[in-house]
A protein has these predicted regions:
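C-terminal nucleotide
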Residues: 1-107, 119-156
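N-terminal pre-core extensions flanking Radical SAM catalytic domains
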Residues: 114-117
Length: 156
């Protein structure tokens, strides 16, 4: 609205940051924070792709953590203000940090609020991670998925 564009992608990143004081007056702080997430996440995705192409999984994990932290802080999509006593996503993310101890990484995934946690867990602690999460959130709360060696591809 502030820039007269239909979508944020049409706004220059530097122009956005320069105009934050005025944008805050027009759109409020939450809109500013969400836009900041979008601008930084757009760059971060490119870095994630590069890290995977270079087979640098440690860098990829750092970027996933940064992305998840940004979702939590700037998108504010981990809990609902309508029921602050229920913050399952935040609890799950905090527990993931405790369980993984830097060996893996987790982040909010999907739409948040009633979304899911995406966790990259080393094979040798998958069972421990799953048990701990299900001890807290209930049976079948944690689903173990595997990524194929070849990733996504078109099937004819």
């Amino acid at each position: 609205a502030y820039f007269g564009t239909e979508i944020l992608k049409q706004v220059d990143k530097n122009e956005f940051y320069t105009n934050i004081p005025e944008i805050r007056k027009v759109a409020g702080d939450r809109a500013v924070l969400r836009a900041m997430h979008w601008f930084e996440e757009t760059d971060r995705v490119i870095d994630q792709v590069n890290a995977l192409e270079e087979e640098n999984f440690e860098e990829f994990k750092k970027l996933i953590k940064s992305s998840g932290d940004s979702s939590f802080k700037y998108l504010q999509n981990v809990y609902s203000v309508k029921n602050l006593s229920r913050q399952e996503m935040a609890v799950g993310l905090a527990l993931s940090d405790v369980i993984l101890k830097g060996k893996g990484v987790s982040r909010v995934h999907g739409g948040g609020f009633a979304g899911t946690i995406q966790a990259f867990v080393p094979n040798d602690i998958v069972d421990i991670y799953k048990k701990n999460m299900e001890d807290i959130f209930g049976e079948d709360a944690c689903h173990v998925l595997k990524i194929r060696k070849y990733g996504g591809m078109k099937v004819l």
